[in-house]
Amino acid sequence: MKVLIVSRTRMSTARCIGGLASDGTSLRLLTSSGNNHDTSSPLLVGQLWDLTYSPISQFIAPHVEDVLLSTQQFVDVKIKPKQYILQRVSPWEGSIDKIFGGLIEYTANNSGYVSERSGVPDRSTGFWIPDSDLRLRVDGQHYDYMTVIKRFGRKFHTFQEAREWGIANPGGTITKSPDGRWYIVKDVTKSKESIREMNGYPLRGLKYVGEESPIKVIPAGTLVRLSLARWWRPEDSEPNFEERCYLQLSGWY
């Protein structure tokens, strides 16, 4: 089967390699022994390969894409990944709320995950076209989905400017966008208390695990690949702490 390599996820000294078959099937390519590949694997993002593989005997949801790779033959590098992908799959489009069936929850540090409690999606990989920028955090390891609401289509670049508008237009609440601009959100009250309450802006993020160096901003409308990490919980966690699959960004096209 012809397979486009769409991701190489960093895993210490190994790589979790993702592929998209010519029939639109999403694959997580494991070695014939069921392990992740070495960093020296010749399977590189953007390359087309002719692969022979078989599904593993037993998978643990949501990681239904696991296959055992038996043979590989290089085919081509003259592939346009975005075009290839969009011809075969229908990506999620719009808000981050739409990915993985809306089952993603977020930690206090704004990192997305799923758990048995929140519900397990029917897959662990997917493509997404976000309606807002994804901005790199200062840690250089996570991206945040930058929600922007323009209910009335008015922008304000300073709090004072926004507050003056709120005073002149009773019933307007003001909330700050992550990039520092102010937007009118909805009609409720013009009080200072309401303005202060709306001063916070919840971020929702995901870890970047691709090999390519991260960029500061992935613009809205960019096709990106998402995945859910294997089930995990910290070794030093409480006995009743739930296992989770954390949300990851594999790359963009």
Residue ranges of predicted features:
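Nucleic-acid-binding small beta-barrel platforms of the OB/S1 family
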Residues: 1, 56, 80-253
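N-terminal ordered "arm"
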Residues: 1-54
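Surface-exposed beta-strand edges and their flanking turn/coil or helix-capping segments
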Residues: 32, 42-44, 64-66, 239-240
